[in-house]
Amino acid sequence: EPYRRQRQMCIRDRSVAFREKLKENYCISGVRQVEKQVSKKEDTAKYLFALEDDHVIESVWMKYRHGNSVCISSQVGCRMGCTFCASTLTGLTRNLTAGEMLSQIYQIQKDTKERVSNIIVMGMGEPLDNYEELLRFIKLVSCEKGIGISQRNITVSTCGLVDKIRMLADEKLQITLAISLHAPNDEIRRQTMPIANRYTIGEIIQACKYYFDKTGRRITFEYSMIRGVNDKEEHAKELAGRLSGLNCHINLIPLNEVKERNCYRSTKEDIEKFKTILEKYRKTVTIRREMGSDIDAACGQLRKKFLTKNGRN
């Protein structure tokens, strides 16, 4: 409420004619902080933000030696239905505007009093399902007159909307494209990701090759390690074969478990073994560093808890 009053006061300083023109042509939208969780190490903070229509979204701030990263949401909820993700539990409510995406970054910079140097569009929602606003956001946030973050420091994650990947490639931006793959074959992928019924892994890989040819940017493949589902030795070998000849980086993710979903994290030993096998096939592999494991780390968890507490779920 104070945030809204502050903006209204700024607008009242302008002429009546100017205010009427703004009212006819523009809508000012932003976010306000509702809740914040800080990890014990103080290197991670999770934010719950409310929008003008009182819907809520999440963002995460992560402090690294090389700079500060923010993971932002692109939609209120998500309609992709991945079985290991809390964001999909309530479905999709609506898309975020470019302004609402930008506002998450501005509010976190204001709260932390630190500059954000890296942006990850990997929070709630499927970014490419909100393509036009995502594109506006990227161009605005990388503009020198705005926050001025280099496109090379922006990562956009997608579950694999092939047509939109090709459209994004034609924009010839310098962002990093991250594919939420999470399976070495279509059979396993269909068990956990409904989008696999629409696009095969083969089609996604072809779109990734097109993206690389157009932009020269290496692709990242995100692979959540799910116990007993996709973490066996044969899965690692199959994944290596699938990605053969593609300029890519594989990011193994210890799964953030969601109690409403029957998915569990692979053991540390199995994750390390998986990594070793991929490296034998000369793949560039990292295991995502765990940050904020003592707070509601999984995407969508904090929002779900808030909605349940307030009888909105």
Question: Predicted segment positions?
Answer:
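Single conserved hydrophobic/aromatic residue that forms the stacking wall/gate
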Residues: 1-7, 11
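Conserved beta-strand segments that form the floor/walls of ligand-binding pockets within enzyme
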Residues: 10, 71-73, 77, 84-86, ...
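N-terminal [4Fe-4S]-dependent radical SAM core
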Residues: 18-74, 101, 105-115
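Canonical Radical SAM [4Fe-4S] cluster-binding loop centered on the CxxxCxxC motif
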Residues: 63-100
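Conserved AdoMet/S-adenosylmethionine-binding subsite of the radical SAM
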Residues: 109-118, 123-282, 288
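A short, acidic, flexible beta-alpha connecting loop/helix-capping segment that sits on the rim
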Residues: 289-295
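Acidic, low-complexity intrinsically disordered tails
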Residues: 309-313
